[in-house]
UniProtKB/Swiss-Prot annotation:
GO terms for biological process: 'de novo' CTP biosynthetic process; pyrimidine nucleobase biosynthetic process. This is CTP synthase. The lineage of its organism: Bacteria, Pseudomonadati, Campylobacterota, Epsilonproteobacteria, Campylobacterales. Residues 1-267 are annotated as: Amidoligase domain. Keywords: ATP-binding, Glutamine amidotransferase, Ligase, Magnesium, Metal-binding, Nucleotide-binding, Pyrimidine biosynthesis. CDD domains: CTPS_N (cd03113), GATase1_CTP_Synthase (cd01746). The gene is pyrG. UTP binds at S15, K188, T189, K190, P191, T192, Q193, K224. ATP binds at S16, L17, G18, K19, G20, I21, D73.
Length: 543
């Protein structure tokens, strides 16, 4: 069996430098050179997964086809690689310890004392190897920053794994910050030198250094970093702030990043075909048209909470050669504002998903305004559920209509807690209000059957069914379906009796879906629901 080659990506100085984007960019170049590539994110935090973490704490939770709740970097990986990943592509310290403790309880360690070395480190190595099976190259991003206590077992694992597979089968890339000091008017390399020194103390010497910076690094500065950090001069790569993250692979390519990678990993001459990517990036940066839509959500102070959705909108804009300007609307503040004033300058209204009652009435207000004023509307997940609540209250005149998530005692729960459903493996799942929150939602890709000649069918190019990803605990109550449809709110998507999509038959574009279309959108393959909504907003603007 052919040996998988590994590229380990670590970060220094501080977090949020963009290790995920750098890793995804390198993966894109390698894939477009004809190699089979995958990426793994190893997160040192002790949560089993990010599923129960606050969006303000950790940003978006990205969901894979197989229902894994993962780090938002997996979204970047999928969007750059244009491939679906799985739960094998993300794990945490919590998951590792959980697995080791379960094995110990089953007696698999034959009574031995369980220690970080070899047991925890061995589990990390096994998970890395599993993710790389059948691939030419696996890129492994280690979350956090070198020097974090939580990250030490992961760094020890990649140090040991490199020795195990041999020098031509693994390399280390270290991403670091080269800050620009305005008072001095110059870039400083000392944080990079200290970060590499910290990495070396752990036993890892980087083969390549990627320097994040506000400004370009001149040749002398790159040479200084190379000499002080012990890497070849062509292995110091700059990663300057860019207008779009999708420029990064092209920027790396201009610096010939693949030549030293090919040399270190003993690969053939790598020549990626990036023509299509390049043309799409040009349309992202300098589109011909412009349209403004309102993005209504409760986490708008932290845009990372909606990362996949904002990226999907960029993809749609590139496909339609249009810059989509987002007007961020805090749904909680909207409750005390005039809808007409807030939405007077937009050509579409998007109501995003979320959890909890805060901001719900503001979202309902936005939906009512879109419905009554015939402005293109897209509701996603909670956005669909609240479209049902709004319609029930204002059209069916069920004034107490609500979701049982927000009012367990309401007389007209048009959205309710589903207690039984089949999961992605075809197994029956049972839920109650007291079921633990972690990993217990309806998660992953499910088939949605589409009503013929509907708006949903139109956006999916008359497909009879599609598979889209879900992350929710509450469902539309089928008891109210007949009344909804009698008054013009049509069910256009279903999954084994569960309502997946609704639309208004007397509106230019009013579509609400229970699934998350943004999770399957890619730069080179935009999701049809997002694209259809942006196209409707453009038509509204033109007319």
């Amino acid at each position: 069996m052919k040996q998988t080659k590994y590229i380990f990506v670590t970060g220094g100085v501080l977090s949020s430098l963009g290790k995920g984007i750098a890793a995804a960019s390198i993966a894109t170049l390698l894939k477009n050179s004809g190699l089979k590539v995958s990426i793994l994110k190893a997160d040192p935090y002790i949560n089993v997964d990010p599923g129960t973490m606050s969006p303000f704490e950790h940003g978006e939770v990205f969901v894979t086809d197989d229902g894994a709740e993962t780090d938002l970097d997996l979204g970047h990986y999928e969007r750059f690689l244009d491939e679906s990943l799985s739960q094998d592509n993300n794990f945490t310290t919590g998951r590792v310890y959980q697995s080791v403790i379960e094995k110990e309880r089953r007696g698999e360690y034959l009574g031995k004392t369980i220690q970080v070395i070899p047991h925890i480190v061995g589990e990390i190595k096994d998970r890395i190897k599993k993710a790389g099976e059948g691939k030419d190259i696996l890129i492994v991003e280690i979350g956090g920053t070198v020097g974090d206590i939580e990250g030490l077992p992961f760094l020890e694992a990649i140090r040991a794994l490199r020795l195990e597979v041999g020098k031509n089968n693994a390399m280390n890339i270290h991403l670091t910050l080269v800050p620009f000091i305005k008072a001095a008017g110059e870039l400083k390399t000392k944080p990079t030198q200290h970060s590499v020194g910290e990495l070396r103390r752990i036993g890892i010497s980087p083969d390549m250094i990627i320097c994040r910076s506000e400004k370009a690094l001149d040749r002398d500065l790159k040479d200084k970093i190379a000499i002080s950090c012990g890497v070849e001069k062509n292995c110091v790569i700059e990663s300057v702030d860019a207008a779009s993250i999708y420029q990064i692979p092209l920027n790396f390519l201009k610096q010939d990043i693949l030549s030293p990678i090919a040399e270190i990993l003993d690969l053939k001459n790598l020549k990626p075909n990036m023509e299509n990517w390049d043309s799409l990036v040009k349309r992202v940066i300098a589109p011909s048209n412009e349209v403004k839509i309102a993005f209504v959500g409760k986490y708008v102070d932290l845009k990372e909470s909606y990362k996949s959705l904002t990226e999907a909108i960029i993809h749609a804009g590139a496909a339609l050669d249009t810059k989509v300007e987002l007007k961020w609307v805090d749904s909680e503040k909207l409750e005390n504002m005039e809808s007409a004033e807030v939405f007077k300058d937009v050509s579409g209204i998007l109501v995003a998903g979320g959890f909890g009652y805060r901001g719900v009435e503001g979202k309902i207000k936005a939906i009512q305004y879109a419905r009554e004023n015939k402005i293109p509307f897209l509701g996603i997940c909670l956005g669909m559920q609240l479209a049902l609540v709004e319609f029930a209250r204002n059209v069916l005149k069920l004034k107490d209509a609500n979701s049982s998530e927000f009012d367990e005692k309401c007389q007209n729960p048009v959205v309710y807690l589903i207690d039984e459903f089949m999961d992605t493996n075809g197994e029956k799942q049972i839920r109650t209000a007291k079921t633990p929150l972690g990993g217990t939602m309806r998660l992953g890709a499910y088939k949605c059957d589409i009503k013929e000649k509907s708006l949903l069918a139109k956006v999916y190019n008359e497909a009879k069914s599609v598979k889209e990803r879900h992350r929710h605990r509450y469902e539309a109550n089928p008891k109210y379906r007949v009344d909804f449809e009698k008054h013009g709110l049509i069910v256009s998507g279903e999954s084994k009796g569960l309502i997946e999509a609704v639309e208004l038959n007397c509106h230019p574009f009013f579509l609400a879906v229970q699934f998350h279309p943004e999770f399957t959108s890619r730069l080179e393959h935009v999701n049809p629901v997002i694209c259809g909504f942006i196209k409707a907003a453009i038509n509204y603007e033109d007319n």
